[in-house]
């Protein structure tokens, strides 16, 4: 009698987050089966966002309870398609968006996809990009131009298109306005460049001189190391010779939130984009009496990705200086450490490489 062969599920390697304050282990996990309209993407790059550190280092809760695969800045190659996924072929280079909308709720139907009632963020609501593969419905994918490296695709998926959405849609920064950005990470540097396209006067605040030097090279009108001045707010106002029309806070700590609102003039707009679980550390009375507008900004609709791709093709956006380090998947904890130590703007993880 012949023994039946076991029907084992295909497996992949992934960095699986279980608990905060612990290293992330590499595990073998089953490949998810494809729905008819799904595309399986072989992940070439997933860059590390500071929000990933919030889960690991601060215990910020993911929407999906762990275990979960983190990572939301994803680019790769189509490996397999579902029966009705006809828009892409194996071998196509694609960008996976950092926020996935349902397309059917009242917000999606009114072109406000970032406010989707069923919004899914890879690495937060669903498994993300620190893995060899991800399955995504074909309607969420965007083609990555052949001349663009995969790490640029990862930047486009989140920080570049998110910055475009913030500047051109959520805030609509105007020519001649004074803008202060707290944080010279990938998002802050991307917002800087988008705001300069709107001919704003842009000033950057950070604690690392090497990042501020990149900001200056990217066109910042002024930079300030907040660790090298007595009172940050006084240093910013002296640099501006006044106060700001728009303040964009990309870090999310109570300290920087207070600093940000204190450099904003009456009637100004304060944008919150640093992902955190803090309560707001300033008085409601200040918002009321100064008639300050608080604006949240998260992600971007898929339709804005082609606009960002065109800006890059037209050489209006720089990005190479934002890529600081590269690591294979099994060095995921070392990759995270580069951000912890302030040694990186964007560190890129390559899930399907064993050596870099």
Label each residue range with its predicted role.
Residues 2-10, 258-262, 302-356:
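C-terminal hydrophobic helical "lid"/dimerization subdomain
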Residues 146-229, 235:
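Mid-domain Rossmann-like dinucleotide-binding core that forms the NAD(H)/NADP(H) cofactor-binding site
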Residues 171, 213-293, 355-356:
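Glycine-rich cofactor phosphate-binding loops and adjacent beta1-alpha1 units
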Residues 32-46, 59-106, 145-148:
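Glycine-rich beta-strand-centered segment in the early N-terminal region that forms part
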Residues 102-182, 320:
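NAD(P)H dinucleotide-binding glycine-rich loop of Rossmann-like/cofactor-binding domains
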Residues 20, 208, 276, 300:
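Residues in the short beta-alpha loop(s) of Rossmann-like NAD(P)-binding domains
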């Amino acid at each position: 009698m012949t023994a039946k062969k076991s029907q084992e599920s295909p497996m992949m390697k992934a960095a699986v987050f279980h608990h905060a304050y612990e290293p992330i282990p590499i595990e073998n996990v089953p490949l998810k089966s494809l729905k008819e309209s799904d595309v399986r993407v072989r992940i070439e790059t997933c860059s590390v966002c500071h929000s990933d550190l919030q889960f690991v280092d601060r215990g910020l809760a993911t929407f999906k309870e762990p275990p979960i695969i983190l990572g939301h800045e994803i680019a790769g190659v189509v490996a397999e398609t579902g029966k009705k996924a006809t828009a892409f072929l194996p071998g196509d280079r694609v960008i996976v968006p950092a926020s996935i909308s349902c397309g059917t709720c009242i917000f999606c139907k009114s072109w406000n996809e970032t406010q989707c009632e069923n919004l899914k963020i890879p690495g937060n609501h669903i498994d993300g990009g620190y893995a060899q593969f991800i399955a995504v419905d074909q309607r969420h994918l965007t083609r990555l131009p052949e001349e663009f490296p995969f790490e640029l695709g990862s930047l486009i998926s989140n920080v570049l298109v998110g910055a475009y959405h913030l500047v051109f849609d959520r805030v609509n920064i105007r020519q001649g306005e004074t803008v202060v950005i707290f944080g010279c990470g990938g998002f802050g540097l991307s917002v800087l460049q988008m705001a300069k396209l709107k001919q704003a006067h842009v000033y950057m605040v950070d604690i690392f001189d090497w990042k501020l030097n990149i900001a200056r090279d990217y066109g910042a009108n002024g930079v300030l190391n907040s660790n090298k001045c007595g009172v940050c707010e006084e240093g910013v106002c002296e640099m501006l010779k006044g106060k700001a029309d728009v303040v964009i806070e990309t870090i999310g700590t109570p300290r920087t939130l207070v600093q940000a609102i204190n450099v904003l003039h009456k009637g100004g707009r304060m944008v919150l984009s640093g992902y955190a679980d803090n309560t707001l550390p300033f008085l409601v009375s200040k918002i009321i009496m100064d008639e300050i507008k608080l604006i949240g900004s998260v992600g971007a609709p898929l339709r804005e990705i082609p606009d960002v791709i065109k800006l890059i093709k037209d050489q209006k956006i720089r990005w190479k200086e934002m890529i600081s380090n590269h690591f294979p998947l099994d060095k995921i904890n070392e990759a995270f450490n580069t951000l912890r130590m302030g040694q990186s703007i964007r560190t890129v993880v390559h899930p399907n490489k064993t050596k870099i």
